[in-house]
Every structure is written in C-alpha cells, then in structure tokens.
Curated annotation (Swiss-Prot):
This is Engulfment and cell motility protein 1. The modification Phosphoserine is found at S344. It is found in: Cytoplasm; Cell membrane. The gene is ELMO1. Phosphorylated by HCK. The lineage of its organism: Eukaryota, Metazoa, Chordata, Craniata, Vertebrata. Involved in cytoskeletal rearrangements required for phagocytosis of apoptotic cells and cell motility. Acts in association with DOCK1 and CRK. Was initially proposed to be required in complex with DOCK1 to activate Rac Rho small GTPases. May enhance the guanine nucleotide exchange factor (GEF) activity of DOCK1. InterPro entries: ARM-like (IPR011989), ARM-type_fold (IPR016024), ELMO_ARM (IPR024574), ELMO_dom (IPR006816), ELMO_domain-containing (IPR050868), PH-like_dom_sf (IPR011993), PH_domain (IPR001849). Residues 555-676 form the PH domain. Coiled coil: none annotated. One of its GO terms (cellular component) is cytosol. It holds the Pfam family ELMO_ARM. One of its GO terms (biological process) is cell motility. Interacts with ADGRB1. Interacts directly with the SH3-domain of DOCK1 via its SH3-binding site. Part of a complex with DOCK1 and RAC1. Part of a complex with DOCK1 and CRK isoform CRK-II. Interacts with PLEKHG6. Interacts with HCK (via SH3 domain). Interacts with ADGRB3. Interacts with DOCK5.
C-alpha cells in the first residue's frame, strides 16, 4: 500500500450524476485514474475525457501539474483538451450567430489554460481568429445596426481569446499580417467603440510593439500619438492605463534617432498636460498599474537626456564654446568688446580668464575642458544655460554674490553645476531601463515641459543657500554636496505634487534641520553603545525577536495579494496567499481583480501544508528566476522573488509587490520553518523596538511614570481671534 503522502482525497463531479469521493494515487498514470473514474460512471472511450478543477479557473489536470492537487480539492470530469479544442474550433465557424457567440465566450474562458491553448493552437486556431477579425468585421457590417450588442460581444470575445492564447508564448508575434495589424489599429483609431474591444486592441498593440521589431515599425505607421490622446481624456482609468502603455512601448522600442522626434511630437500634442489634468489630478485614486505606467513614462522621458549626459564637449567646437561665452555675457553684461588689435587681445584673454574664475570653472583659461567628463558631459552646460536664460535674476545674483566673496568662501557655480547635474542624474537613474515592478513616479515632473531643467534650477539655488548656511570653503565642497543630496532625497520622498511644493519642502530642510536630524541619530547611537546598555539589549533581544516573529506570522494570516508577471507584458492578474490562523496551512488561489481587504480562506482554492515545506529560496535561486526571459535580467524583480519548495520538484513562486512585503513573507516563512529572520526589515524593527524598550526601562529607573492613556484633548478656545493670515 502506498504511503499516505501519495494518496489524495478528492471529490469528482460529472453533469447529471452525484459527485464521487475518491482517493487518487499520485503514483498511478493520470490516464489510469481517468479510466477508473469513467468506469465508475460507465463511460466508454476514456481517452476522450480529462479532469479539471471545478473552481472558476477550470484548468485541466495534467501530468505536469497533478502534484498541485490537495486533499479536499473538487475536480470535474470533462471532455479532453483535444476534444474540447476540436469542438470549439468547429463551433466558432457556425453559421448561427448565437452558436458562434456562445462558442467564442467559452473559448475566451478556456484559453487561459495553457493545456487547452496548446491543443487549440495545434489546430491553427490563432490563424482562424485572425481571419475572423480581418474579414468577419466586414461580413457582419450590415448586421451592426440591427445586432450591434451581439456583434460587439462577438468581437470582444474573439480578441479576448486571442490575447489569452498569445500570452502563453507558444506562437511568435512575427507571424501576423499587415491586414490584421491595420484592423486592430482601426479599432483604436475609432472615436466610438466598445470599451472591452478598445482595451483588448490596445493590449494587442502593446504586445506587438514589445515583442517584435518588425511589428513595431508596422504599428508605428498605423497609430499616431494624436489618435491615442482622446483615450486619455476619457474617464475609464483602465483604458487610460493601456493607452499610456502603448505610448511607452512605442517610446521604448523606437530607434535612438526616432526617440527625440517622438518626444517632440508628445510635447506638441501636450501629452504631459493631458496626463496631468485627466489622470494625475483626476478625482480618483491612481491604481498600481497606472502608477507603474506613469513611472515608465517618467523614466523614458528622463532617458532622453542620456545622449547629452554621455557627450563630451569638443573644445574646438565654436558653437559649444559660444554657450560658455553666453553664460559669461549674461552674468557680467560686457558693455563693448575691446578693439580687435594685438594689444587688446591680451587684455581680452585676461578679462575672460578673470570672468571664468568668477563663474566658478575649474579651468579658468579653457572652461570647455570642465565638460569633458561623462557623466554629466554636455548636460551640465545645457542646465547652466537654461538657468541663466530662464532664471536670469537668480543666476546673476548667485554669480555676483560669489564673485564678491573672499576666495576661500566662494561657491563655484561652474563646478557646482557640473557635480549637481551628475548627482541629479544618479538620483533619477537617467539611462537605466524602467523596472518591471516599480511604480515610483513623481507628480511634480508632469507639471512642466522642462521638468529636469527646472529641477536643476531649484537645486542649484538650494546648493548656494546651503553653502552659505554651512559657511563652506572650497575644501568643504564634497560635504556640501552630501548635505544637498540628503535634502533633495528627503524632499522627494514626500512626493510633492508640484515644483513649487518641492521648493517649499526644501525650505524646511535647511542645513540646521539636517544637522538636528543627524545629531539626533548620532546621540541615539552613542547613548546605546555603553556596556550596561549592551548587556540589557542582549538580555531582552530574544523577547523582542519573539514579538517580531508574532507580528510576521499575524501578517501572513492576514495575507497578501500578489501580481502575476511574465516576460512578455504586465497583466492585471492577481493571486492571494494567506496563512491559516493555526499556522498549519497556506491557502492560495487566483483572483479576477485586486481585492479590497482580506480574502476569506474558503474562497482560496488551493492549500499547502506548512509541514510539506522543504525550503524557502530567494532571488536567483528561485525556479521562476532561472527560466529564460526578460524577468531574469531585471535586478529589481530578482530582489522581490522568493519560492517555497515542497514535495519533489514542486514549488510555489512569488514576486512580492514591494520590498516591505518581501521581507514580511520571507521572515514569516523562515519563522514557520524555525529559521532565523534575516531581512533588513527585521534588523530595523529590532533596533527600533530595542531602543524603545530600553528608553522605557531607563525612564522606569528614574521613577518616571508612563501613563497608560494619552493626555485628554483640551476644550476648544472661546474664540479664534488669535488666528491670522500671515500672507
């Protein structure tokens, strides 16, 4: 008799019959189990039957995934994938509109299953669907007026099935005709079309562009930015998301020489202001997928600066040298050039050298040499010229202020601008490809057409202000840059909605404030390094670790919604996983949409006993990170990946929504297995809680009573005459 681990108790349904309770021996071939089930109901030709999950997924059971069957699973006996695919292939060609519609609806649902998808594709099903899209629209054109809902549903189900089938990566995108691309593009270009058809058409175009260079060129010929913009001005956030995704895909795959041209078109069509008005400042919350697409657009826009950032200045190029002359002219407003004589030439050179020194260049004789380092290359000079022309008063004030100071206290504008540009490029990761999972967009960068230049202008004035506050000398240059970086980073974390708000945040982060923050952190560190405190820490640390462990397990009991990602395109598909209250079982299952709150245990179809877990692996050790594809190459996805290994060659793969959830889950799973919690979050929590506990105990030594309840809220004043408007 096989060991209990190989026996799974399930219920099996068959239409028109009572469900059967059955024990499945996982060592038996699947065909033998299906034959046994068919014999129980006296059904012949068992090879025409298969088992599938009876939940909403309806996925077929195969030799590859049969290990996912757990005790208590409800299965359904149904026609085999090959039979089902053959029947649907015939039904969708029916002359009856109702029969065709029902068949396409079933096909759209079943195509999510890779087992069925493979069988349908083997029947050349993809070609059939593309033919229906290409010719079917004309064939039923006359029926639109009298059967418009039916026609719309039919096309919607056809496109849904196509998207699901292609998402499995079985068929190459390069196989599609120009006629099919034109037809899909025509749905996007129409001003009035069914929302579901538009959404799927946008998804298809995005995948075409991302997965095939040839298709990118064909799609780019059929779709213009002007045709996409009306979809951003609507109220449907999903359509807006897919529209921005198509724009991002076109941007990402465009040849280098086309990207700047495309950026100019986006500026002409006022894409930024449309997104700001209809998406960012719309009266609704921005969901994660939209935030991701906005982040991608932000990254791709800033990456246009990479060419200038990596371009060295040519000291012999007169046009480039003229920019430096212009900086000097604006700052010092030379009244008239000396007469062009041999005597005045030396005088002119001397005057230029003096002025270039005042401008803060390292090389006073030939400042062009300052811009030969990449990064930031010519981008620094571009920023300086923008500041001089568009913020002329501030530029002149900074230059003249510093030229009138003593040498050792002057803030060198030229050197500062070059180093600041380099620092801002590092902060914004200019030149790096967008992450698959990040959604860290900044609304303020969508409020101005020249947002990077304006960002620089604010920060160069901050640098000058901080320099004065620090009473810095040239030896303190690197220290000033470190303080400025800290100020900028702290202000950015608050996600200001505009550049003016960003400027206000920086006003509150003066050098004095940064010193207070640093001093507070340093004092806390020093106070807690004495020997008695270290001994006390060591004594209470196990208690704190147990508290952290319980918090991690409680979070696992609450559960988390994870996103399903693949290398081809992002999907709005979700699954949920949570730990049972007794910490014995992990419940998980697919979801149609992102949940609002917790998902009940009974609605999650699959179970994994904690006792079956063999190990938890992370990063590149995860099975789903070893597979070929774009995800393998993405560092940020790699840092969020972890897998649970159980049984033989079975795993449950995760990609956490963010670093915090990654730490929570890896800590919690390690705690379940009796291993140490090693995440950065655990270290931070341990430090915070230890610090708090020690402070409370020290207060107790001083006989200072900590109240159990917060102090009462005082009554409102009798009047508010003391309130005044400071403006």
């Amino acid at each position: 008799m096989p060991p209990p681990a190989d026996i799974v108790k399930v219920a099996i349904e068959w239409p028109g019959a009572y469900p059967k309770l059955m024990e499945i021996d996982q060592k038996k071939p699947l065909s033998a189990i299906i034959k046994e089930v068919c014999d129980g109901w006296s059904l012949a030709n068992h090879e025409y039957f298969a088992l599938q999950h009876a939940d909403s997924s309806n996925f077929y059971i195969t030799e590859k995934n049969r290990n996912e069957i757990k005790n208590g699973t409800i299965l359904r006996l149904t026609t085999s994938p090959a039979q089902n695919a053959q029947q649907l292939h015939e039904r969708i060609q029916s002359s009856s509109m109702d029969a065709k519609l029902e068949a396409l609806k079933d096909l759209a649902s079943l195509s999510r299953d890779v087992t069925f998808a493979q069988e349908f594709i083997n029947l050349d099903g993809i070609s059939l669907l593309t033919q229906m899209v290409e010719s079917g629209t004309e064939r039923y054109q006359k029926l639109q007026k009298i059967m418009k809902p039916c026609f719309g549903d039919m096309l919607s189900f056809t496109l849904t099935a196509f998207v699901e089938l292609m998402d499995h990566g079985i068929v190459s995108w390069d196989t599609f005709s120009v006629a099919f691309i034109k037809k899909i593009a025509s749905f996007v270009n129409k001003s009035a079309i069914d929302i579901s058809i538009l959404q799927r058409s946008l998804a298809i175009l995005e995948s075409m562009v991302l997965n095939s260079h040839d298709l990118y060129q064909k799609v780019a010929q059929e779709i213009t930015i002007g045709q996409l913009i009306p979809h951003l001005q609507g109220s449907d956030q999903e359509i807006q998301t897919y529209t921005i995704a198509v724009i991002n895909a076109l941007f990402l795959k465009a040849p280098d020489e086309r990207r700047q041209e495309m950026a100019n078109i986006l500026a002409q069509k006022q894409l930024r202001s449309i997104i700001l008005t209809h998406v960012i400042r719309a009266q609704r919350a921005i969901n994660n997928e939209m935030a991701h697409q906005l982040y991608v657009l932000q990254v791709l826009t800033f990456n246009l600066l990479e060419d200038r950032m990596m371009t060295k200045m040519d000291p012999q190029d007169q046009a480039q040298r003229d920019i430096i002359f212009e900086l000097r002219r604006i700052a010092f407003d030379a009244e008239s050039e000396p007469n062009n004589s041999s005597g005045s030439m030396e005088k002119r050179k001397s005057m230029y050298t003096r002025d270039y020194k005042k401008l803060g260049f390292i090389n006073h004789v030939n400042p062009a040499m300052d811009f030969t380092q990449t990064p930031p290359g010519m981008l620094a000079l571009d920023n300086m010229l923008y500041f001089a022309k568009h913020h002329q008063d501030a530029y002149i004030r900074i230059v003249l202020e510093n030229s009138s100071r003593e040498d050792k206290h002057e803030c060198p504008f030229g050197r500062s601008s070059i180093e600041l540009t380099k620092m801002l490029c590092e902060i914004l990761k200019v030149g790096e490809l967008p992450s698959e999972t990040c959604n860290d967009f900044h609304p303020m960068f969508f409020t101005h057409d020249r947002s990077f230049e304006e960002f620089f202008c604010i920060c160069i004035q901050l640098l000058n202000k901080t320099w004065k506050e620090m009473r810095a000398t040239s030896e303190d240059f690197n220290k000033v840059m470190q303080v400025v970086k800290e100020q900028v980073m702290r202000a950015l974390t608050t996600k200001p909605s505009s550049l003016d708000q960003f400027k206000s945040k920086l006003q509150n982060l003066s050098y004095t404030e940064i010193l207070k923050i640093r001093q507070s952190e340093r004092m806390n560190q020093e106070d807690f390094q004495s020997r008695p405190i270290l001994e006390l820490k060591e004594k209470i640390q196990p208690e704190i670790l147990e508290l952290i462990k319980q918090q991690r397990l409680n979070r696992l009991v609450e559960g988390t919604c994870f996103r399903k990602l693949n290398a081809r395109r992002r999907q709005d598909k979700f699954w949920y996983c949570r730990l049972s209250p007794n910490h014995k079982v992990l419940h998980y299952g697919d979801l149609e949409e992102s949940p609002q709150g917790e998902v009940p245990h009974d609605s999650l179809q699959d179970k994994l006993p904690v006792a079956d877990i063999k190990a938890v692996v992370t990063g590149k050790d995860c099975p789903h990170m070893k597979e070929k594809g774009a995800l393998k190459q993405n560092k940020e996805v790699l840092e969020l990946a972890f897998s649970i290994l159980y049984d033989s060659n079975c795993q449950l793969n995760f990609i956490a929504p963010d670093k915090h959830e990654y730490c929570i889950w890896t800590d919690g799973l390690n705690a379940l297995l009796g291993k140490d919690m090693m995440s950065d979050l655990t270290r931070n929590d341990l430090d915070t809680l230890l610090s708090m506990e020690i402070k409370l105990r020290l207060l107790d030594l001083e006989n200072i009573q900590i109240p159990d309840a917060p102090p009462p809220i005082p009554k409102e004043p009798s009047n508010y005459d003391f309130v005044y408007d400071c403006n």
